[in-house]
Regions:
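Divalent metal-cofactor coordination and adjacent catalytic microenvironments
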Residues: 1-85
Length: 85
């Protein structure tokens, strides 16, 4: 799986401690799974949005655990769910 690398998530979330980076990477894998379970489409056309959604969902979960996603993230999720293959 892992559409984004450990380094990408560390950079996006501005993390510099290995323990936090490891936690964020595991969380990113969980966010990727959630997106797929919600029916999000990851194709050549949607790949950039899919990766950005994983990063944004991960950062949001790190900063605001358990809170509802902001509208921008929700819009990306909806766009991916209704994307054509």
């Amino acid at each position: 799986m892992a559409v984004i690398s450990r380094d990408e998530i560390a950079s996006y979330c501005r993390l510099d401690e290995d323990a936090l980076i490891d936690e964020a990477f595991l969380l990113a894998e969980t966010m990727e799974s959630r997106l797929r379970q919600k029916g999000a489409v990851d194709t050549a056309v949607t790949h950039a949005t899919f990766c950005l959604a994983v990063k944004a969902m991960t950062l949001h979960e790190l900063d605001h655990p358990g809170e509802k996603y902001p509208q921008g993230i929700q819009d990306m999720i909806n766009e991916l769910k209704f994307a054509k293959n």
